[in-house]
Amino acid sequence: AASDVYKRQTYAGQLKLRPYQTLHFELGRAVVGQCGSLISKVLYVKQGTRKKFAILDAGMTDLIRPALYQAFHKMENITSEEPLEAYDVVGPICESSDVFGKAIDLNKVKRGDLIALRSAGAYGEIMASGYNCRELPKGYTSDELV
């Protein structure tokens, strides 16, 4: 609309860029974060005395945000339509902080299922590490919306 054009022109006029300058900006986590998911395979399901654990092949080396500052990533079992059950979702690294989430409701999990950790597009790949001799995660891109 005309008001949008006016706002852009006003903003551009206030920047006062010199002819040799260009403006670059980062989209940021609010946009980019939603554009990526970490897909991980379930290695084991372990029944503890009070809770169940879903142990994934991805760990804090692949997505460190939950271990580093308790960031929450929505999780879903993308291969099961069975009823929901609560799981502590953890990685295989021998560190007590290798935890993606506690008491996460997922469709019943079994070995080999695929778990999607959503909103991993920002900082996931760039913060990954080879700690504990682990390979870096593989990245795939698509222009399809799912």
Q: Where on the chain are the PLM-derived regions?
A:
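Charged (often Lys/Glu-rich) extended helix/loop segments that serve as interaction or gating elements
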Residues: Q21-V146
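Alpha-helix-loop-beta-strand connector modules within alpha/beta enzyme cores
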Residues: K7-L15
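Short, small-residue-biased leader/transition segments that mark boundaries at the very start
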Residues: A1-Y6
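Acidic/histidine-enriched active-site and ligand-binding environments that engage anionic O-linkages
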Residues: R18
